[in-house]
Design a protein with these regions (language model features):
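Core nucleotide-handling region used for phosphoryl-transfer chemistry
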Residues: 1-198
Length: 198
């Protein structure tokens, strides 16, 4: 039997990164180097560049372009933008696919893909694909007051991702010590998802 040590407990009062919680659908772009071995299902491969293979996924499954196999057109978008998305490099790149026809819609006439990893992607990294955006950072610092300050700013000023949209969903708090995301909603935050009403 393999021994599993109890994990270290991260300190709560460490730096956090607070981003706007976009109301769309979870999505991912996965890029693998096929020359390194390992198994992958070619049926789900959307694009190839040299030894790199690209895949698209929702929160729970692989998706491919097509009416019955896609998730709000994300796989089709990935296929179309593959040459630029290969700039993400090898790895699993999570984000939110949002806009026209998805959840709140944000009053947009198109869809957007916003990457979650704000430390890696954004204006500070010239390799950030131009077809992607990054979830807006609302605040950074210690956990004491930052969460309430960011919630108040979002409530009063509306969405930073889509200026003028006054019904944003909430925030995501990334706790740097635990490497974990936590969400705080502007409405029904204390109510389980299945019981919340709009």
């Amino acid at each position: 039997m393999e021994f599993h040590a109890y994990p270290k407990t991260p300190r709560l009062k460490r730096d956090i990164v607070i981003t706007e919680k976009l109301d769309g659908t979870n999505a991912q772009v996965v890029i693998v180097d096929t020359s390194k071995g390992g198994a992958y299902d070619g049926n789900f491969c959307i694009a190839k560049q040299g030894t790199l293979a690209m895949f698209a996924g929702s929160r729970s499954r692989w998706i491919t372009p097509g009416k019955l196999t896609d998730n709000y057109g994300f796989a089709g978008w990935v296929q179309y933008n593959a040459p630029e998305l290969f700039e993400l490099g090898e790895g699993q790149h999570f984000g939110e696919w949002y806009g026209q026809g998805i959840q709140r819609g944000y009053g947009l006439d198109h869809k957007r893909f916003a990457l979650f990893n704000t430390a890696r992607w954004g204006a500070h990294n010239p390799n950030t694909p131009k077809c992607c955006e990054v979830v807006p950072v609302l605040g950074t610092g210690s956990m004491d007051n930052e969460v309430n300050l960011c919630l108040d700013a979002l409530r009063l000023g509306g969405s930073l991702a889509v200026p003028g949209f006054m019904n944003p969903e909430g925030i995501i708090v990334y706790h740097t010590a635990s490497k974990q995301n936590f969400k705080v909603l502007l409405e029904n935050d204390d109510t389980p998802k299945g019981l919340a009403t709009s």
